[in-house]
């Protein structure tokens, strides 16, 4: 049997920060660029939304007069952790907040543009929005100086290139959260996955399916390195070599994979990569074995690529995890969908999500709608085929952590249908 | 305060300002005065409070009416209508036109002027008289100025034996003659109006007879009290009686206070003028909505109860100004223009300001919710502000450092610009405000130089002064004060940037305006948060002094005011005894039992005397009027059962013979406090609660200050017999308690353990009962308190309040422990005398001490604390400590030459000025510095360096300095009771052997060094420019890369958190952070993160080959 091929092009260029330097620049530029870009989009949409209303700036507001304003949201949050807390006088024995979510009923939204800020009230639920989102609002200024929102316009799902028609089944496998080196990692489980993908497992039918897998995407957190190695204290020399142990193990397993098919390796929050988004590709020197194959490609996070002209975009999950901390939704997919509607992969960057201080661009803006949008390292597998107003179709996928669930996700390029590959090493399961 | 000396100086000098009519605040009629009484002139600062009358305003300062009209010409119509929106509500028709209803208002300020006596109200008098003015606000928010007529200044002398009515009239004539001699240029027809014979008694010493004759001398004008007193004290020859000098009584009381006492008015209470008893002013003198004239006897003063305990809707103006300073100089009014004034006006009791505006020089882009008013000239800005004050008519003006900076600056600036019509900011028409320098000195608050700007009819409340009075903080910058109380960092724009922003465009000026507004809002928020209005009004009500006294004067006026009120009820008069400033009459202070230092791991019960000193005074009836001096004791021959002999050997009569006034005042204060606390429990309304809580606090402070009043040797009425008796009783009680506890709670007495008193302070005793649970210790503590209280005279009471467990006793007045009031859970960690907040300590010390105490007391983990100390010291020596933790900050109060001893921060400021004069700290700034490594033998002051400079140039800090001069003492203090050999263990262990010092990038030697790449793994020099690792380390590539990238990752996280925090404080996402607040704990970290980040990325890029 022969493995199918798909034409691959890597679109990560926009996430590279190779030439960028820290020269004292601040975060205001990235907000400015974002606002500028999004405002053009939103202004273009206003005539078809509420053509009769004037568009103004925060400054131009007049009390009681209906108008539309466009700006960046800022969410004032009481419980938001602050670095200044380290200096607070009293230390409390018990943490006051559940660590996973910083919402509070007193939270409120503020809209900001270059001219000023105004507090929002009315038909805009603070729970659904976060700092950094650019939107247009219809409403009027009240006598108290607040802006009473009546209606909200988001930029919406961006336009999409047409989905190419592919006549045969071709699969892409997504896996994330291997956490090699942690206690939860089960080497046998991962080996089963590798064997399945490489066609060493199962009957002929299964093997033929495996041969249709054209690519594997590893969406972050492949290793787990004990944080004690990085807290500044000296590390005993016998421990030093242990730092790299999980990476070597990963390399060995990856080498098996890349020997038979192309693999995209994305960094995640626990991987030996930089912290801020966009995370730069894991260094090739970490993969002494796998890197010798040209099927191995180390990618950035977020990661963007095309396979047979099907457009993919995905992250290792930090953007969605952060939304989960600072806002509320029925499930993770809703967060994913929101980032598309806001046309921004990581609106909370740089506010609560680390991010490089760009001066002239905001690489997380989503200008064209992908066909597949995946997010790694989530609690459970969720998927949905999202339909846009302009007939855009996007497959949204939350990839569960493999070390917890033993689940990898398989996507069919032909019809964007999704299924799971589930591996278990215990008999009762 | 000494007006005597000052007044004299000013009088000779021409009034400043171009106009001869510039406000001149002096004595009546502008007439040359006799030299002020010798006592006050000779000792200008010695008295805590000089009782000279100062609240006199001259007719002369008032401009002619046509002048006024001229000033108001060509004012901008548009501006006028803009400002008029904020006027006070209009008067109801019946008040506006007639006099048919009672007028009730809450008064805030009382002063007086000299004017012609009122023809209608006082048909029988003529000539100049003192007219009292009461400023206040009605319940509906209307401003009132009530002019009170007919109240005359007076004082007493004791009547010489055998003086009859004829003698009195002769005496009158003689005195009148002497007065005329010393007040030659005065146009007053009669100086001494009359002399009455009254029956009074002096407060000093026990007197068996109820009363004796006194002469009440009534003079024409308040200032004549002092000159008349001088004549009488120096001696006067009376026909038939010979030459005699007199002791005067109640001759040093401010006229306004005298009036308040006699009319039963207390500070901030409600006053009602009944319908028909007042008339509308014929000639309107003030900008108040309602101006009345009435007789002092017709005023109704309401006690602060029920409806009358509420607050009127005062208008509180909070403002801040910005000046464009020149580079390298602190703004000076002679050179630097005022460019912005931000104003917020809030109604008392409301959460949000109802006026928010900013006045700017040159255009300024609009700001949401703020009225931006831009002007082309500075003159227009200043005049607009004056008009604004007049329209809004604030009752209280607040701000941060307004008394020393903002207000004087505005006025002096207007003088420089020759805007004569600017300083009419008070409530009196055309009366100009002027700046005077004053010094204020008091035992409690220390000596303070300040400027005094009297704005008639408006109370000034400078939050900076209030903070300095009421709180001990390590820094009083607005930034650190708001961080402390509001939990917020304030953006701080360096004054060198302010000029750049001003010279930019309307956007940059808007940026500045936003900053200025924030600075104007913070004082208001502090005022609300700390309930200052409630607390100060209540304090004024309790002690009976005007609110303005509370900030501008010391403690003793408050006690004196109460004493005078009480004495008046009792028909007693208070002699004018000037305290001797000599320190000879000192007496033994409070006792402190020997502290048995140690770390106690059994519960320690604390027995406290509730209000010990007030209780002693009440229990033993200690007062001026119960004291029997030794010479009298023999004469009076009092039976021993009717007197108390105090341990210090004084004699006081018992209450059944004569009840003391001080005990009575104290009883009332404490009873009122009890009542207020009970009411507080009942009260639901938050405003009512605020008032009551303020009241109980004021009552407590007042009760405790009575003792201090009697002991203040330079005070108004010192009486060391009382204060030394109080402390001697206190000592006796502490010893007595110790003895009783140790005698009763013994194994012999049937208890499990022998109790041990381990320490005793002024009013508390710490007992170790030996039991091991908090609950048992509480039980025994209560038992002991009840048992011992039974042996004392009421109301002295020993209370059991709290348990310390565990308890670390370091030495006297220094301890730490967990504080328990219930057996389940401790309340807090309580420390005393352990420097966690001292100014000249760096943050590292504070963190270290706090963390150690936490580990020792809460976690009960002594080894953990030791390990923590070792790690921190090791970090310090290995140069891993965040630089901001090492910054020491000191204020630069004067220039280098003025300092006698060389100080680190002064030297540094000098050096920085040589580097760059524009950003170097100037006088008034705080100078942050770190101690760096320098040549051997260099003095500490030579080794100070700017933290920014240190960061930029990789200069090594001196860890030994920090180890020896900063952290060792506080640490050893804590650990010595716990560890043997603490010093050796903590400061000289193996953890101190590894040292790492960074190489400075600007030192001389580096200019000769050649840079070579080294292997990132082992620091071996590698040849070839594009390699990262040496041959040997090649195999560890993955591991070493992980470490490098891990480092970058940490820095990125820090970088993001720090810079987004600054965006948050700044309140804007789209604008660059400008803040350079060196008080902010993250300022240096932010800077360092930026620099480290750039370096770490360079390292990371070395892997990209």
From Swiss-Prot, chain A:
GO biological process: DNA strand elongation involved in DNA replication
Top-level lineage group: Eukaryota
Gene3D superfamilies, per database record: 2.40.50.430, 3.60.21.50
EC number: 2.7.7.7
KW Nucleus (keyword) present: yes
Locations listed in the record: Nucleus
One Gene Ontology term, aspect cellular component: delta DNA polymerase complex
Swiss-Prot/TrEMBL catalytic activity: DNA(n) + a 2'-deoxyribonucleoside 5'-triphosphate = DNA(n+1) + diphosphate
Gene Ontology molecular function: DNA binding; DNA-directed DNA polymerase activity
UniProt keyword annotations, A-Z: DNA replication, DNA-directed DNA polymerase, Nucleotidyltransferase, Nucleus, Transferase
InterPro entries membership: DNA_pol_a/d/e_bsu, DNA_pol_D_N, DNA_pol_delta/II_ssu, PolD2_C
Segments forming a coiled coil: none
Major subcellular location class: nucleus
Quaternary state and interactors: Heterodimer with subunits of 125 kDa and 50 kDa.
Chain's role: The function of the small subunit is not yet clear.
Family: Belongs to the DNA polymerase delta/II small subunit family.
This protein's name: DNA polymerase delta small subunit
Lineage start: Eukaryota, Viridiplantae, Streptophyta, Embryophyta, Tracheophyta
Curated annotation (Swiss-Prot), chain B:
EC number: 2.7.7.7
Residue positions binding Zn(2+): 1015, 1018, 1030, 1033
PROSITE patterns named in the record: DNA_POLYMERASE_B
Top class in the EC scheme: transferase
Transmembrane annotation, as ranges: none
Cysteine-cysteine disulfides: none
Zinc finger (CysA-type): 1015-1033
Cofactor annotation remark: Binds 1 [4Fe-4S] cluster.
An example Gene Ontology biological process: DNA-templated DNA replication
One Pfam short name: POL3_N
Predominant place of localization: nucleus
Needed co-factor(s): [4Fe-4S] cluster
Keywords, ordered alphabetically: 4Fe-4S, DNA replication, DNA-binding, DNA-directed DNA polymerase, Exonuclease, Hydrolase, Iron, Iron-sulfur, Metal-binding, Nuclease, Nucleotidyltransferase, Nucleus, Transferase, Zinc, Zinc-finger
GO MF assignments: 3'-5'-DNA exonuclease activity; 4 iron, 4 sulfur cluster binding; DNA binding; DNA-directed DNA polymerase activity; nucleotide binding; zinc ion binding
Residue window of motif CysB motif: 1062-1080
A single cellular component GO annotation: delta DNA polymerase complex
UniProt record similarity statement: Belongs to the DNA polymerase type-B family.
Quaternary structure and partners: Heterodimer with subunits of 125 kDa and 50 kDa. The 125 kDa subunit contains the polymerase active site and most likely the active site for the 3'-5' exonuclease activity.
Entry remark concerning the domains of this protein: The CysB motif binds 1 4Fe-4S cluster and is required for the formation of polymerase complexes.
Main function: This polymerase possesses two enzymatic activities: DNA synthesis (polymerase) and an exonucleolytic activity that degrades single-stranded DNA in the 3'- to 5'-direction.
Protein name per Swiss-Prot or TrEMBL: DNA polymerase delta catalytic subunit
Organism of this sequence: Oryza sativa subsp. japonica
